[in-house]
Amino acid sequence: MAAAYLDPNLNHNPSTNAKSRLSTGMERSPGAIERVLRVFHYFESNNEPATWSSNIRHGDATDVRGIIQKIVDSHKVKNVASYGLRLSHLHSEEVHWLHPDIGVSHIREKYEQSHPPEEWKYELRIRYLPKGFVNQFTEDKPTLNFFYQQVKNDYMSEIADQVDQEIALKLGCLEIRRSYGEMRGNALEKKSNYEVLEKDVGLKRFFPKSLLDSVKAKTLRKLIQQTFRQFANLNREESILKFFEILSPVYRYDKECFKCALGSSWIISVELAIGPEEGISYLTDKGSNPTHLADFTQVQTIQYSSSEDKDRKGMLQLKIAGAPEPLTVTAPSLTIAENMADLIDGYCRLVSGASESFIIRPQKEGERALPSIPKLANNEKHGVRPHAVSVSDEFSGDETDDYAEIIDEEDTYTMPSKSYGLDEAGDYEIQRDRIELGRCIGEGQFGDVHQGVYMSPENPAMAVAIKTCKNCTSDSVREKFLQEALTMRQFDHPHIVKLIGVITENPVWIIMELCTLGELRSFLQVRKYSLDLASLILYSYQLSTALAYLESKRFVHRDIAARNVLVSSSDCVKLGDFGLSRYMEDSTYYKASKGKLPIKWMAPESINFRRFTSASDVWMFGVCMWEILMYGVKPFQGVKNNDVIGRIENGERLPMPPNCPPTLYSLMTKCWAYDPSRRPRFTELKAQLSTILEEEKLQQEERMRMESRRQVTVSWDSGGSDEAPPKPSRPGYPSPRSSEGFFPSPQHMMQPNHYQVSGFSVAHGIPSMSGNMYPGQASVLDHMDSWNHRTPDINMWQPSMEDSGPMDMRSLAQVLPTHLMEERLIRQQQEMEEDQRWLEKEERFLKPDVRLSRGSVDHVDGNIQCPAGNQHIYQPVGKPDHVAPPKKPPRPGAPSHLGNLPAHNSPVDGYNEGVKPWRIQPQEISPPPTANLDRTNDKVYENVTGLVKAVIEMSSRIQPAPPEEYVPMVKGVGLALRTLLATVDETIPVLPASTHREIEMAQKLLNSDLAELINKMKLAQQYVMTSLQQEYKKQMLTAAHALAVDAKNLLDVIDQARLKIISHSRPH
């Protein structure tokens, strides 16, 4: 086999002096002529399928076998014997299958005389199929994918418009499933996903034009969604096999048929069928069964020639073992006979495992014989430059769970040629003797990273970081390694790691500026307890400026994560690791085709469709901000890469980090919008982060001032100091951005109230200090801390007090005798302990707010009395005593006018309003007694009690219960409700007609309550094992509580109707 090698970076026109972009090419002997052959194939790459090709240099001694070998070697193909090379004329149906032993130069001389070179197309195809080829190809993934692409292309170009609509839909949906293996089965139900498929990818890639033109867009969308569901659970390989299974009855891709005649004359017209299962067979008509002629193992020799008559037909003779005479086949032309001979010869070589041809070609007088095939020297073998190196091999030495292989094809991306090349990198070339290699400080994708010193004329001892490449003897690995440097050389930004230079000779080095504090993730973990919130927001802001700069340069980074950010100083971080960065020439998006990618950081469209844009970088930046706020915790801990997209599709997002300002988390959630068009751009993120950072700095300064004031506050043991206590600062005002939906951060809202002083009671005219200094502050924080901000007895600071001088313990001692002072302190201590016990008791009886809008009111004496507090919570039988939160015990000497305040301003209600919903626990439903009626044989009362008991039982069991137990619990509540409603239906006839309407409304309300409970149960089951599960469990409890309350309301309505009967029956 003569030497040939790949050069994917050559332009597609033949050239005699073309060079590799990052290498000078293979050494050639003087006088040798090398040309380039462009060969199209079906190895999937980054470009459109019509452009999948490789450029191969060849010399005078290169044969077809050498061309095939070089292409398949670069893809690690096992079934090399199945491949053949086809030459076809673009403007006619002329096709030639090229025998492996023929020289490429001879072929070009022969055929390019009849047509120009640009009209010929060289195409690598799988032609020779082994028996059971599907099973055999499943062990050779590149060959399986190649054959699938070949068959799919033939189907789309030849018969797709003639097949049944159902088959076309199935085959198209199988191709979608295969192409986007990470996509969830229900992903196309989302409008944004379908639009990506329809507009960005294009439906014509999957479905024939006849189908797209004949079906309305809305109908087509429903058909695609319905059909896709059938194959939702298939993986890539299963999709391919299913494709073959559906297609085989309508298109025989596993055999070739030729119209010819058996014998040396046109006596028997047949269709000769050649394939792995049939061997060599023929059919006399379409409906007949094939007649077997011979197996490939029986063929001994093959000869072909042209007839000597005026028609110049092709004659094919096969010598069959055991046959008395050769099998003669007459073909319409010599070309067809030659193609048949090549096909049978390929099968014979495949089944016998021989490399020698079975074709006998007698040399005619004057015909130039092919030169002998020189053996490939060992040094040439090692010098051959493969087309590409599998990315999985590159990552094998440094593989982590952060990255996962998402597809099976290769990435043939190359940077824009106008700015990339070693010729232009000359300015960055550094002499190796100027670099002093130091200790290893980390590991990279291609090799180790070392600390070192660069002796430059400007700086004789510059500390640098040096990336080394372990296996850069291969030009393709060397090119990929240098690609990061050639990307970085375009950037000049204070928060992007700067490229110092490169050494392109082996061993290849990339020299960059050294960030002494290392990776941001490790830095955050080590400094977790010393970094404040402002520093974390500062890092996020600095990264946003770097990414806004990349966005303006039309680059996508594709690997934004804390591990790829370096810390230059405690207040400066820099974005690094541009190994996955890509330039978007068309300013739309970049589609990845191979590589290990960080799934847990990626946007859904990147996982589903391998689609990378600035918007997908925004998603990753949101995840990176979350990492920073979590001090280096990785996202989706404990979740498999394959499960991440499912959680995102279900609406799950990373939770808000502790101490994260709501404004910042709101910004993160905007970055995680499922629809890429709804995500902010980096310029917007930069501006908003700048505002959030300034607000945090102001709040930090305010907290520091507060802290300093607390430190200088007059202590009880002031040592005789007469200085007055500091005047408290003014209450905080809302942020000017609050109108845009920004709120104070939770850690600030939960800070102790600095405007309040723990007080002591009033006696003998001494003002009480138990109140709030500034009552107005309660209006700002009432929903968070309304107990602390309840209306005070007497305002703490009054003008008269400011003028009266200090009021410390020494002044009190002058007013009160010593024994009274001690008594006062003891009483205060007792009151504090009493308050603590009361608060703990209050928490135990804490309940969610009773809905006041449920429509049930009590008609007492003709007045409408709205429910308040716990009046409408039913008390079950067996607990006759009213069990409600106890009133706070009065303090000795404390004024009692608080009891006259409205219910909604009471301390108890205010305290309950401030309780976090996640602190709500299953509770007793304990209402006050109902109407004073005789309950003997009262079926309604008994069934209401039974329903409430069922709700209580469900509430107590729901938290630890697995999802499969939800249905029996809810079913128990439903049965109790059905019994109650049946009893009410029996009771209605004896009640006044004027009350029927109200009773029926109460019944309908109970039915809607049960429907709501069932709906929440379904959601809790659907989102099991996600962060939303607990939320829906709480909503189940709320719905159950509402059902119990409304059942009690129904009983109240019936009791009121009964009281009307009693009142009318009494004599006036």
Swiss-Prot record:
Composition bias, Polar residues: 10-23
Record's bilayer topology term: Peripheral membrane protein
GO aspect biological process, one term: signal complex assembly
Domain named FERM: residues: 35-355
Keyword Disulfide bond among record annotations: no
Domain of life, source organism: Eukaryota
Record: active site: D559
SMART domains in UniProt: B41, TyrKc
Sequence segments annotated as region (Disordered): 1-26, 699-750, 869-912
Family affiliation: Belongs to the protein kinase superfamily. Tyr protein kinase family. FAK subfamily.
Name under which the protein is recorded: Focal adhesion kinase 1
Species whose genome carries this gene: Xenopus laevis
Gene name as annotated: ptk2
